[in-house]
């Protein structure tokens, strides 16, 4: 007989594990709505080029790509931001700005499976399109911080930030074409600094700029006053990047005022090739990888054929976030088992179940043909707290018996008093 198992790198989530994912989803959804964001649901399958155009080297190598029956090259989405950008151009471009959208969905990457890395995983994220202000950046970071605060993680996490516009402006000034910029930033992201500097040296032929690159790439934990000092350097003015440092200084100062824990890492870049300004990742001391990340991508929508539109967003790794939560207690309703002692009691069993479900109880009807002496300990072992027992005598008197399966306390009451009886026994 053929035996089927999950595909490597993918996982089933059952019971409490599934409930934890749904809990994170509902927590994120409720928060995003309170910030004024509307939900967007995009297809899992998109054109390959949508992601390949500015996904970055690593992302392109790990995409699930296939051709459909019409010979179109398609891909399972490896992330959701490009889909939101495409949907914005297709449906929302004429709407008042900024557009605030949030999403929750599965993404697919053919990575080597390991702890914290899967081939199917979930992302929760937001995109704000049509606003280039520092207020937009702060709103996005504040929402991200508050999500982790709701999970009681805000004291543990650190948001690592940088302005990739520093690198972009220098390379643009010296006419380094986009694909080579992407490759250089990819090498920096993979901590292959010397390789990146070698390529820059070949293309810039300017030792002072290479030395400056090297200087900022080594500043992994930069203080606020250091950013202000860097902004005043003569070489910074000469390279026309003073505004990029001043922006980082302003943003950092306000984050400090908001008591958001962050660190400035001038050597930090992100693997996705579409970032143009602020970039950030959420770090937790218990794991070696980031659990969320995002940034500003002011040119992506224009690249996709839309009108120039600044944008910023982030994606939260749902499974990665769950890995760092020590004690996530999902509030569950009281589990109730309804047991009828004869066929005559079946209509009453269903009527009782309907009543209790309307009151948010979790109700299961017993289908086992076993004596009560076996059923009660069995359901107690399965996590049920209350048993509703309907026998012949109860049926004749329009009564029910309510039993606490933990304390074994039980009372018989008229059917209309069922909810009060459950509360009495708990």
Swiss-Prot record:
One of its GO terms (biological process) is histidyl-tRNA aminoacylation. The keyword Protein biosynthesis applies. Disulfide bonds: none annotated. It catalyses: tRNA(His) + L-histidine + ATP = L-histidyl-tRNA(His) + AMP + diphosphate + H(+). GO terms for cellular component: cytoplasm. InterPro entries: aa-tRNA-synth_II, aa-tRNA-synth_II/BPL/LPL, Anticodon-bd, Anticodon-bd_dom_sf, His-tRNA-ligase, HisRS-like_core, HisRS/HisZ, HisZ. Its main location: cytoplasm. Pfam families: HGTP_anticodon, tRNA-synt_His. Its EC number is 6.1.1.21. Keywords: Aminoacyl-tRNA synthetase, ATP-binding, Cytoplasm, Ligase, Nucleotide-binding, Protein biosynthesis. Belongs to the class-II aminoacyl-tRNA synthetase family. This is Histidine--tRNA ligase. It comes from Saccharolobus islandicus (strain Y.G.57.14 / Yellowstone #1).
């Amino acid at each position: 007989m053929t035996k089927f198992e999950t595909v490597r790198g993918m996982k089933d989530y059952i019971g409490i594990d599934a409930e934890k994912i749904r809990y994170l989803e509902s927590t994120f959804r409720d928060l995003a709505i309170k910030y004024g964001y509307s939900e967007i649901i995009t297809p899992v399958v998109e054109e390959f080029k949508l992601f390949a155009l500015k996904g970055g080297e690593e992302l392109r190598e790990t995409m699930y790509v296939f051709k459909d029956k019409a010979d179109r090259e398609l891909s399972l989405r490896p992330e959701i931001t490009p889909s939101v950008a495409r949907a914005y151009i297709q449906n929302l471009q004429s709407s008042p700005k900024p557009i605030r959208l949030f999403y929750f969905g599965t993404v697919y990457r053919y990575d080597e499976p390991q702890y914290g890395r899967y081939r199917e995983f979930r992302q929760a994220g937001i995109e704000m399109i049509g606003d280039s202000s520092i207020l937009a950046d702060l709103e996005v970071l504040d929402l991200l911080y508050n999500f982790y605060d709701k999970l009681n993680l805000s004291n543990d996490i650190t948001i690592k930030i940088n302005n990739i516009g520093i690198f972009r402006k220098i390379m643009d000034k010296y006419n380094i074409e986009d694909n080579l910029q992407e490759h250089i930033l990819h090498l920096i992201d993979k901590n292959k600094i010397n390789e990146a500097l070698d390529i820059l040296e070949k293309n810039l032929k300017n030792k002072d700029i290479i030395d400056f690159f090297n200087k900022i790439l080594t500043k992994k934990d930069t203080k606020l006053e250091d950013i202000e000092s860097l902004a005043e350097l003569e070489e910074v003015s000469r390279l026309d990047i003073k505004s990029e440092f001043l922006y980082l200084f302003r943003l950092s100062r306000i984050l400090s005022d908001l008591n958001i824990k962050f660190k400035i890492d001038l050597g930090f870049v992100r693997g996705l090739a579409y970032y143009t300004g602020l970039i950030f990742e959420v770090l937790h001391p218990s794991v070696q990888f980031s659990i969320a990340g995002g940034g500003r991508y002011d040119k992506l929508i224009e690249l996709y054929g839309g009108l120039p539109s600044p944008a910023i967003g982030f994606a939260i790794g749902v499974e990665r976030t769950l890995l760092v939560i020590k004690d996530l207690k999902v509030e569950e309703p009281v589990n109730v088992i309804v047991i009828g002692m004869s066929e005559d009691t079946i209509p009453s069993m269903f009527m009782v179940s309907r009543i209790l479900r309307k009151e948010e109880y979790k109700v299961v009807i017993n289908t086992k043909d076993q004596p009560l002496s076996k059923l009660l300990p069995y359901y107690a072992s399965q996590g049920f707290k209350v048993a509703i027992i309907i026998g012949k005598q109860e049926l004749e008197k329009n009564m029910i018996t309510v039993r606490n399966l933990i304390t074994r306390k039980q009372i018989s009451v008229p059917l209309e008093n069922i909810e009060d009886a459950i509360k009495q026994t708990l």
